[in-house]
Amino acid sequence: SFTPDEVCTLTIEFYRRNYIEGLFLSSGILHSPNYTMQLIYETLYKLRTEFHFQRYIHVKAIPGADQELIQRTGFLADRMSVNLELPTAEGLKKLAPHKNRKNILAPMRLVQSKMAENQNEVAVYRNAPRFVPAGQSTQMIIGATPETDFQIINVAESLYKKFELKRVFYSAFIHVNEDEHLPARTGDGPPLLREHRLYQADWLLRYYGFEAKELLSEKNPNFNVLVDPKCNWALEHLECFPVEVNRADYHMLLRVPGIGYKSAGRIVKARRMGTLDFTDLKKMGVV
């Protein structure tokens, strides 16, 4: 493992050579959660104060570490994340019984509450220090345990609502060793296309006004890897189409395959000036 000084030196050298524009700092547990979190804090403190590194820093909060340590680190970082590891508590208990779901969620709740508190401080005192101004995120491993896509996007939706996360990252499971609790090795490799569909669905949850229950259900629990989730929704809701672009509201326009939030905004703005036709849509890049 690297010492705080070594991480700082490497970061500055790479930055000066234009190899990097920021730092993502993570760590396994060394000795104890507090010991590890202290090392992370010292690294960020040195980077910010001694090396005057003011670029983007994304850092991991260590579950089980002292709240004060996490808070002090948060004032030095731009973004902080806690890995959820696996989508469900059952999966975590099966593959990582030494880890506790409550311990993972606790620092998430701490970061959320501290962010809200800090926003009030900044509103009153303009020069107050910022606490993780880029928000918090998490990551889930996909394919190591038998959760369906429906379960996974429901977990993501819940995290966005309850913890106000900025991003949920999905990582396709890669076999590195054999274990009776892991899925059998196949020649197909990591489920990268499934990971891609989950990212597309996640985008629909965050920016397009979809809910998890609209995209999948217990009867239809997994995405079609051959069709993107938005197009799949449209195929299952043909009663909603065709859509009249001159009358449909912004939220319905967002549900039309091929129309993104920028195009939907352009349509709503342009139709105030008159009726739109195919040529108008083509000029806007919608078709």
Feature map (PLM): residue ranges:
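Radical SAM enzyme [4Fe-4S]-AdoMet core and its adjacent flexible, acidic
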Residues: 93-101, 161-207, 267
